[in-house]
């Protein structure tokens, strides 16, 4: 789901390899979820073209559950989701009153747009845009109140790109929520223990032992990059 991946159609030798056989058969599944009193109808378009971006991952559900249990206030907030995949986290934020930009690589946007149209009523504040970490984050404003990401920390070569993107997007008084499956083999713990704390005040907001998912909350530690 991480939207730092260069478009695999144009960069076959990128650090974001596709597992062609991961979802070899192309098909769609529709799932229903309920958070904060909203019923979310989410379509997952499985196929080798989308790869890991096709599905709703456990970390996304954990983050939505956290927003519900903690009554996180999105009303009137400027929100951006990174590596959205299906868009479920950003869609919930929009339904909760946020002014939301949902982002991923260009090839994922059609799936996200379909889910936005299926769940966010006309007039709802949810837009879908392409964003590749470390490449075009500067075309986005740097004053978001909330920056969201679910299971986007799993490829070590992308960590510096993600860190730079977070530093740019998060406003001076903004908050970052990152939910992540803690995969030791992917260096996930190292990102949260060593990289992110260099620039952000970081705290573990919630730990889901059953799913091995951590939810972190971060705020700027010092002056933001120019």
UniProtKB/Swiss-Prot annotation:
Residues binding S-adenosyl-L-methionine: 57, 83-85, 104, 133, 150
Gene Ontology annotations of biological process type: peptidyl-lysine methylation
Cell location: Cytoplasm; Cytoplasm, Cytoskeleton, Microtubule organizing center, Centrosome
Disulfide bonds: none
GO cellular component: centrosome; chromosome; cytoplasm; cytosol; nucleoplasm; protein-containing complex
Record has Membrane as a keyword: no
One term of GO molecular function: methyltransferase activity
Annotated catalysed reactions: L-lysyl-[protein] + 3 S-adenosyl-L-methionine = N(6),N(6),N(6)-trimethyl-L-lysyl-[protein] + 3 S-adenosyl-L-homocysteine + 3 H(+); L-lysyl-[protein] + S-adenosyl-L-methionine = N(6)-methyl-L-lysyl-[protein] + S-adenosyl-L-homocysteine + H(+); N(6)-methyl-L-lysyl-[protein] + S-adenosyl-L-methionine = N(6),N(6)-dimethyl-L-lysyl-[protein] + S-adenosyl-L-homocysteine + H(+); N(6),N(6)-dimethyl-L-lysyl-[protein] + S-adenosyl-L-methionine = N(6),N(6),N(6)-trimethyl-L-lysyl-[protein] + S-adenosyl-L-homocysteine + H(+)
EC number from the UniProt entry: 2.1.1.-
Keywords, sorted A to Z: Cytoplasm, Cytoskeleton, Methyltransferase, S-adenosyl-L-methionine, Transferase
Pfam families, per the entry: Methyltransf_16
Signal sequence, start to end: none
The keyword Manganese is assigned to this record: no
Leading EC class: transferase
InterPro entries: Methyltransf_16, SAM-dependent_MTases_sf
Family classification: Belongs to the methyltransferase superfamily. METTL21 family.
Task performed by this protein: Protein-lysine methyltransferase that selectively mono-, di- and trimethylates 'Lys-165' of the translation elongation factors EEF1A1 and EEF1A2 in an aminoacyl-tRNA and GTP-dependent manner. EEF1A1 methylation by EEF1AKMT3 is dynamic as well as inducible by stress conditions, such as ER-stress, and plays a regulatory role on mRNA translation.
Assembly information from the UniProt record: Interacts with members of the heat shock protein 70 and 90 families and of the TCP-1 chaperonin family, as well as with HSPD1, STIP1 and tubulin; at least some of these proteins may be methylation substrates.
Protein name: EEF1A lysine methyltransferase 3
Organism: Bos taurus (Bovine)
Source species taxonomy: Eukaryota, Metazoa, Chordata, Craniata, Vertebrata
């Amino acid at each position: 789901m991480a939207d730092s991946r260069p478009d695999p159609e144009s960069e076959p030798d990128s650090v974001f390899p596709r597992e062609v056989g991961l979802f070899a058969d192309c098909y769609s599944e529709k799932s229903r979820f309920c958070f904060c009193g909203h019923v979310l109808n989410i379509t997952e378009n499985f196929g080798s073209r989308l790869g890991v971006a096709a599905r709703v991952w456990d970390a996304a559900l954990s983050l939505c559950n956290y927003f519900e249990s903690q009554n996180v206030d999105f009303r009137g907030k400027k929100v951006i989701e990174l590596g959205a995949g299906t868009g479920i986290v950003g869609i919930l934020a929009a339904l909760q009153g946020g002014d939301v930009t949902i982002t991923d690589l260009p090839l994922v946007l059609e799936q996200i747009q379909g889910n936005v149209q299926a769940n966010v009523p006309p007039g709802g504040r949810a837009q879908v845009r392409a964003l590749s970490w470390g490449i075009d984050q500067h075309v986005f404003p740097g004053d978001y109140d909330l920056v969201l990401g679910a299971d986007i920390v799993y490829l070590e070569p992308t960590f510096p790109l993600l860190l730079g993107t977070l530093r740019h997007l998060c406003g001076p008084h903004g908050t970052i929520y990152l939910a992540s499956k803690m995969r030791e083999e992917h260096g996930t713990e190292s990102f949260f223990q060593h990289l992110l704390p260099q620039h952000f005040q970081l705290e573990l907001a919630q730990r889901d032992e059953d799913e091995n998912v951590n939810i972190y909350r971060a705020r700027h530690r010092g002056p933001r990059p120019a």
